């Protein structure tokens, strides 16, 4: 707390609820810190250090500020004594770290501030071991009063791969290097298989538990910890991961040992994709009902095989390349035959329905279909007509396990903006982009969802999906601006 002048009064509200308030919180005030733990789990402890009287903090006393003071909240007891001078040094060290990090980021003539803010957000959602969280919160509702409340504090292959690829393209290769090591570390035994998601330390078991004693945000129950989606088959996940691995292989091959380790991982992923792409799955939206043959899942399986074949060619593994190219061709033929629906003049969400889905917009950026293909043009226009509402996009607007979605899914609006841009509707794309930027909070942060009417941010916050898509879309316009300036 930086004191400027006068004698201002402050009161500290310190109410930690360890172990999700499943037990009573106990406070142990020592001469150095306030130690907090729960009656339901006394192994996990929190330590609050401060230059203010510690007992006064616990008693909610009012303090008169006459000089700089500090608070330090830690999950570990500090070995070295903590004082105001040390904390000022730690603050300066932190400031220098983030200044250096942003200095390594590409700069742009327009939208640079929002690009930088989003990249910082993605970085802060990264763990030191390379894992990247989908969000930092659990159970903030997609719509107030409904039950679409999920725990996003995990590392999905899909979300993390997209986040890391965004950081990689903007100049942060170290993030990609660490993530690759994290993925490799999840195989602790030869018989291990890939999951779609992991805990931040590589945990495989992510059992979902409902905390009935908590009322939730604005009384939106249930509050969940854990996520049972880790059991699901989501065939699209490997496409995002393989796209990242290909970019990494192409630009940062590494040592011979690293190349060989990566090649073993690629072969394992290819084997899984070949075995699974014909099977129904839960898709990018993690449907909790019966699996379907989602078009976006088939497309991303094609991406996985296509990128695997490219890597094989780089390594002169032509037999592998040939096999995977043939399998990729089979997927493309299958999608063109079963995914395109003449009745709606568009690709559909799944082989067995005529529904539209925002994930269909990803067919072009991942190279499955050309931007000038008439089928993609028609799909973009059909998706826009069906799912764009008041400047924002539904991911889909048909019934699922919980009814019809009632809020906008932020990343989908960015997908539409890119799709409109590449099919030539650049002015409309720019207008939509400038409009959605107005719906961030005062720090430029986005959650998962936005209310169509009030523009209130909903869902878990901040959301990696939203920020990686914002960066990619902003870069699209910034690169065009650069071309116009230096033409």
Predicted regions and their residues:
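Acidic, mature catalytic/reactive cores of soluble proteins
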Residues: 2-487
């Amino acid at each position: 707390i930086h004191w400027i002048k006068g004698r201002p009064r402050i009161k500290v509200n310190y109410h930690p609820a360890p172990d999700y308030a499943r037990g009573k919180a106990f406070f142990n005030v020592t001469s150095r810190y306030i130690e907090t733990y729960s009656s339901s789990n006394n192994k996990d402890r929190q330590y609050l250090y401060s230059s203010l009287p510690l007992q006064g903090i616990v008693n909610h006393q009012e303090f008169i500020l006459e000089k700089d003071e500090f608070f330090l909240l830690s999950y570990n007891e500090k070995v070295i004594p903590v004082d105001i001078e040390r904390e000022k040094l730690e603050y300066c060290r932190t400031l220098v770290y983030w200044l250096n990090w942003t200095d390594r980021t590409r700069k742009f003539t327009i939208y640079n501030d929002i690009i930088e803010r989003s990249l910082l957000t993605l970085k802060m959602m990264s763990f030191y071991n390379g894992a990247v969280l989908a969000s930092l919160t659990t159970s903030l509702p997609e719509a107030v009063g409904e039950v679409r409340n999920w725990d996003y504090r995990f590392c999905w292959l899909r979300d993390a791969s997209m986040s890391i690829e965004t950081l990689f393209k903007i100049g942060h290769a170290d993030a990609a290097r660490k993530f690759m090591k994290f993925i490799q570390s999840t195989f602790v035994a030869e018989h291990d298989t890939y999951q779609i998601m992991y805990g931040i330390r590589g945990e495989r078991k992510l059992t979902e538990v409902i905390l009935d004693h908590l009322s939730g945000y604005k009384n939106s129950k249930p509050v969940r910890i854990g996520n049972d989606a880790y059991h699901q088959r989501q065939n699209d996940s490997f496409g995002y991961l393989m796209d990242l691995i290909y970019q990494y292989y192409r630009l940062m091959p590494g040592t011979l040992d690293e190349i060989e380790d990566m090649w073993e991982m690629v072969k394992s992923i290819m084997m899984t994709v070949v075995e699974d792409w014909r099977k129904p799955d839960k898709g990018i939206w993690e449907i909790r009902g019966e699996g379907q043959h989602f078009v976006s899942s088939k497309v991303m399986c094609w991406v996985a095989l296509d990128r695997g074949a490219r890597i094989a060619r780089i390594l002169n593994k032509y037999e592998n390349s040939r096999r995977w190219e043939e399998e990729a061709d089979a997927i493309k033929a299958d999608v063109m035959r079963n995914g395109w629906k003449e009745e709606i003049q568009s690709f559909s969400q799944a082989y067995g329905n005529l529904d539209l889905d925002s994930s269909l917009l990803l067919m072009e950026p991942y190279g499955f279909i050309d931007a000038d293909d008439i089928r993609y043009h028609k799909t973009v226009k059909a998706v826009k007509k069906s799912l764009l509402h008041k400047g924002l996009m539904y991911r889909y607007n048909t019934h699922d396990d919980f009814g019809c979605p009632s809020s906008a899914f932020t990343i989908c609006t960015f997908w539409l903006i890119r799709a409109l841009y590449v099919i030539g509707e650049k002015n409309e794309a720019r207008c939509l982009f400038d409009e959605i930027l107005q719906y961030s909070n005062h720090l430029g942060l986005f959650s998962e969802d936005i209310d169509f009417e009030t523009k209130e941010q909903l869902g878990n916050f901040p959301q990696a999906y939203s920020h990686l898509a914002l960066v990619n879309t902003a870069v699209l316009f910034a690169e065009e601006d650069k071309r116009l300036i230096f033409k």
